[in-house]
């Protein structure tokens, strides 16, 4: 009980320090995460070792870059939770077979099945929330990432592909240079406006 209270205090402190607004995180989702953390316990020293799974500085940049990165984060969470679900036992053992396996300390095999089912349902709930957010708020990023992944599928050994790619290069090189130049100009104008505001 004391450990649960301590975990809640630490989570609140972490949300405050990192500047995360919990207004988008439904209360039920927050509660579900807290319950899952009881199942996936690690020492506090490991949780706060200074090496987050998703480094904070990766979220720097303009809005478009942040959106693309956050799409990748949501996709990674989808994969991670899918992996966590696969690690859970799929079905309880047939009757009579629990005599063969020793119960874990403090629980019987009969007690473990509902706990695993509860963990599974909670993980499924979190997965659905992530998938909903990704599907409804990150569609453009999804399309862009699929287009980027398709670039990796280009047949490098194909002579036709090589020739066509060379033919298309001047036009694409022009677009890439112009895009980078326009972005740099916009950044300089923004910096100049900010300097003017500071002087005023």
From Swiss-Prot:
Family assignment from sequence similarity: Belongs to the type II (or gamma) interferon family.
Organism: Oryzias latipes
Name under which the protein is recorded: Interferon gamma 1
Disordered as annotated region, ranges: 91-114
InterPro entries with a match to the protein in the record: 4_helix_cytokine-like_core, Interferon_gamma
Composition-biased stretches (Polar residues): 95-110
Subcellular location: Secreted
Induction (free text): Isoform B is up-regulated in response to 17-beta-estradiol (E2).
Entry-linked PANTHER family: INTERFERON GAMMA
Keyword terms: Cytokine, Glycoprotein, Secreted, Signal
Task performed by this protein: Probable cytokine.
Any single biological process term in GO: immune response
Signal peptide: 1-22
GO cellular component: extracellular space
GO MF entries: cytokine activity; type II interferon receptor binding
Glycosylation sites: 30, 158
Database matches in Gene3D superfamilies: 1.20.1250.10
Tissue specificity of this protein: Isoform A: Widely expressed. Isoform B: Specifically expressed in ovary and testis, with strongest expression in ovary.
């Amino acid at each position: 009980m004391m450990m649960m209270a301590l975990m809640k205090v630490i989570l609140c402190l972490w949300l405050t320090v990192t500047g995360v607004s919990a207004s988008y995180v439904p209360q039920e989702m927050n509660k579900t995460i807290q319950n899952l953390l009881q199942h996936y316990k690690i020492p506090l020293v490991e949780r706060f070792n200074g090496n987050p799974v998703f480094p904070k500085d990766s979220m720097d940049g303009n809005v478009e870059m942040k959106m693309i990165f956050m799409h990748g984060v949501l996709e990674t969470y989808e994969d991670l939770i899918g992996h966590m679900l696969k690690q859970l036992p799929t079905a309880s053992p047939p009757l009579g077979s629990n005599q063969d396996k020793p119960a874990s300390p403090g629980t019987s095999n009969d007690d473990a099945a509902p706990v695993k089912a509860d963990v599974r349902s909670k993980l499924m709930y979190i997965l659905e929330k992530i998938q909903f957010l990704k599907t409804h708020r990150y569609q453009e990023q999804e399309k862009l990432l699929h287009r980027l992944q398709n670039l990796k599928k280009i047949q490098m050994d194909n002579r036709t592909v090589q020739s066509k790619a060379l033919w298309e290069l001047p036009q694409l090189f022009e677009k890439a240079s112009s895009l980078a130049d326009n972005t740099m100009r916009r950044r300089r104008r923004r910096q100049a406006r900010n300097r003017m505001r500071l002087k005023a």
